[in-house]
Regions:
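Intracellular coupling helices
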Residues: 1-3, 283-324, 378-391
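Transmembrane alpha-helical interface segments in multi-pass membrane proteins
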Residues: 277, 298-341, 357-360, 364
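Hydrophobic alpha-helical transmembrane segments of multi-pass inner-membrane transport and secretion
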Residues: 10-36, 264-298, 326-327, 364-371
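Alpha-helical transmembrane segments of integral membrane proteins
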Residues: 1-58, 344, 386-392
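"Rare, low-scoring activations can occur
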Residues: 67-79, 156-160, 177-267, 344
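Hydrophobic secondary-structure segments that place a key small or acidic residue at a functional site
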Residues: 111-202
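Membrane-helix entry/capping segments
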Residues: 2-14, 239-276, 295, 340-365
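Membrane-proximal extracellular/periplasmic loop immediately following the first transmembrane helix
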Residues: 35-117, 145-147, 211-212
């Protein structure tokens, strides 16, 4: 009978140890997922994402008057024309344009670049940092008269991929207007990222083309946001029938955050599973401690008669269960590391798996286990030893 009970007890402890492994692993994974999500939301993207409002006009012409009108408001810092925000955010779905140029050796080279439609105020509105050259000169008159020389600004990723020390003044061809015009590089901006940080920043160029600028991007002061939006809406409605009738706006920061909706859903699901795993593990601890104290009531009574303190008896039980947490911690760490290593590998830009996350997972389980064990054993350890022996 004793051997059978011993085997049964060993099996129960083994199952509890497995539950500890699962709980610690999930805690570790949850911590890293939340750390990565925080990293994604706070990483410097090379642009100003806060307080930029985007409005769909439905038309690319008759907007200059509207632009000048809203700039009269001191809370409106900058206004630019551009494409729809989701076009920038989903740029990674496009293959981009193949642009060609002649290098210093007189040989033709080419590079695939993403096109970002912009006007002369785009760099200022989004806070892009101009490293070399000058900004775009958006001249609608010259564009439609056929005298526009198509200046473009490239990002640093494009400059590095072109392997040219100074690209300012270089002519490139291809992309929009293939076979009809050449483009001239007038500036280089620091890399900026509209897309998800799952992918590296791609070579890109900014170019003015009025037909592609159906949205207005407005940089507003952080103070009096609603008041400024009401003012913009009033001026927008005064533009009827040139604009679409419905005034719709979105904040650029909100649109960017939607890039990581998948990660937020994953973090919520993982948190729910982690809580469930911890609860199940603690229920196992609770049940096992209850069974153990009942089986060892006589032992506890004898220890008390021989002078043992209640605290010492509780400590004995705590050390026993902490031992199982420690054993579970050993396989949980490499398991959590492997799972998260493969998950983080999906991101071009990622956080680090800090040592304190591993330690924290083990300490949380150890702490909850201690509270559960103390809560269950203190009552038994504190009762009169005569009563314990009589119970036996």
């Amino acid at each position: 009978g004793g051997q059978k009970n011993g085997k049964k007890g060993g099996l129960i402890r083994g199952l509890l140890c497995v539950q500890f492994v699962i709980a610690i692993t999930l805690l570790l994974c949850t911590g890293i997922v939340f750390k990565q999500l925080n990293y994604l939301q706070n990483k410097d993207l090379g642009l100003e994402k806060e307080n930029v409002v985007s409005i769909y006009t439905g038309l690319w012409y008759n907007v200059d008057g509207f632009k000048q009108e809203i700039l009269k408001n001191p809370n409106v810092r900058s206004v630019s024309m551009g494409a729809e925000i989701t076009d920038y955010l989903e740029g990674d779905k496009s293959q981009g344009d193949v642009l060609r140029w002649t290098d210093e050796r007189g040989e033709t080279d080419s590079l695939r670049m993403m096109c970002i439609w912009a006007d002369g105020d785009f760099v200022n509105t989004f806070g892009l940092k101009l490293l070399k050259g000058e900004g775009l000169k958006a001249d609608g008159g010259a564009y439609f008269s056929g005298t526009y020389d198509f200046p473009v600004i490239i990002n640093e990723a494009a400059r590095k991929a072109m392997k040219v020390a100074d690209p300012i003044g270089m002519e490139i061809s291809g992309g929009f207007g293939v076979g009809t015009n050449k483009k001239r590089i007038v500036g280089v901006v620091q890399d900026f990222n509209f897309q998800s940080l799952r992918q590296k920043i791609k070579p890109a160029y900014l170019m003015y083309s009025p037909e592609c600028l159906g949205n207005i991007h407005i940089k507003i002061a952080p103070e009096h946001k609603q008041e400024t939006l009401n003012f913009i809406q009033k001026k927008f409605e005064e533009m009827a029938p040139f604009f679409i009738k419905e005034f719709k706006y979105k904040f650029f920061s909100d649109a960017l955050n939607r890039n990581y909706e998948q990660e937020r859903q994953q973090s919520r699901m993982l948190l729910a599973f982690t809580i469930l795993a911890v609860v199940i593990a603690m229920m196992g601890v609770f049940g096992l401690v209850t069974l153990s104290t009942r089986q060892r009531t006589k032992e506890i009574g004898i220890r008390k008669v021989n002078g043992a303190h209640s605290g010492g008896i509780v400590k004995m039980f705590c050390l026993e269960y902490l031992k199982w947490v420690g054993i579970a911690f050993v396989p949980a760490c490499p398991l959590g590391y492997l799972f998260m290593y493969h998950w983080l590998d999906e991101f071009a830009y990622r956080t680090t798996m800090s040592w304190w996350l591993f330690l924290g997972g083990g300490l949380i389980i150890a702490g909850i286990t201690l509270l559960t064990v103390i809560g269950q054993t203190w009552r038994t350890a504190s009762q009169n030893p005569v009563r314990s022996l009589r119970y036996e």
